[in-house]
């Protein structure tokens, strides 16, 4: 396998990935595998089902967010105080209806690209990978079922939720398939740039949360490096995951594309047209800058 594209989770920040994909298409870089989790899973499945990037961008900008995010606040509050059975914040029905209209499952199963999405089994705590031959709407809903926000979904009778809980950047399938060029699209600059120290409690919380999202990816990269050059216990000298195609060995190179600024907590749930438009533009510009002269 030559090329793989990895799409991280990150809620509304997923619009950034559309811009990155627009640049990759323009550059003639077509992945044979696309792996995604959470919002990255939705984008991956859209790509695998044959949706044009122009359609994806249009969809991101125009869908009715008020219908999409139907809040069940009273049930949620009552469940917090144990006055009734646990209830998530959002009603998943609008998202299920949207995905049913958006995703052509027949086209997805016939895709020439390997599409892989993830979800976590609540009972076994197992991170599971599903490919395009088996994916249906339940799998996509499960991968995007952010805990507390959306309810877990049942796959083969077992409850599953957001794969990003355990691995927000699912690079392992690409590594295992021996992809020679891997482009990883992060939805945060954390792990992709040197950052200023946080100056407020909110910034501390934001950075802590971002670190939790990048952790599994950093661990995967450290493991990959250690297979080539064993490190003493407690030490990891693997190159930063951020350096475009600098994380290379003889038979494999990994590039990272990421925003060049902190996006803030609100960006996770801000599906407004202004933010979507801005993030698509930033995704394109960051990819052009960070991958210039490095993809072929």
Residue ranges with predicted function:
Residues 8, 31-49:
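Catalytic nucleophile loop
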Residues 115-121, 151:
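Short beta-strand scaffold segments in enzyme catalytic cores
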Residues 1-34:
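Helix-rich "cap/lid" substructures immediately adjacent to catalytic or cofactor-binding pockets
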Residues 10, 20, 40, 99, ...:
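Conserved small-residue
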Residues 68, 103-114:
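A short alpha-helix-loop-beta-strand transition element characteristic
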Residues 141-179:
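ATP/pyrophosphate-binding catalytic subdomain of soluble kinases
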Residues 18, 22, 44-45, 171-172:
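Short, hydrophobic alpha-helix immediately C-terminal to the catalytic nucleophile
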Residues 3, 53-98, 122, 127, ...:
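Non-catalytic peripheral regions of patatin-like phospholipases
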